[in-house]
Amino acid sequence: MATIKVTQTKSSIGRLPKHKATLRGLGLRKINHTVELEDTPCVRGMINKVYYMVKVEE
């Protein structure tokens, strides 16, 4: 399966609780924290939910 790198680019302070939970689900904690995840529909859906706070590299 292909992998993607997801980097948090903005703070989660003041965001919707669901969006904070989505970031935690992706494994992101701090600004500029990067995680490598499998490219699955579930992960893509989570990224789409918080697209304004993350950067994705394929």
From Swiss-Prot:
PROSITE patterns: RIBOSOMAL_L30 (PS00634). Transmembrane segments: none annotated. GO terms for cellular component: cytosolic large ribosomal subunit. GO terms for biological process: translation. GO terms for molecular function: structural constituent of ribosome. It comes from the Bacteria. Keywords: Ribonucleoprotein, Ribosomal protein. The keyword Transmembrane does not apply. InterPro entries: Ribo_uL30_ferredoxin-like_sf (IPR036919), Ribosomal_uL30_bac-type (IPR005996), Ribosomal_uL30_CS (IPR018038), Ribosomal_uL30_ferredoxin-like (IPR016082). Part of the 50S ribosomal subunit. HAMAP family: Ribosomal_uL30_B. Belongs to the universal ribosomal protein uL30 family. This is Large ribosomal subunit protein uL30. It comes from Vibrio cholerae serotype O1 (strain ATCC 39315 / El Tor Inaba N16961). The gene is rpmD.
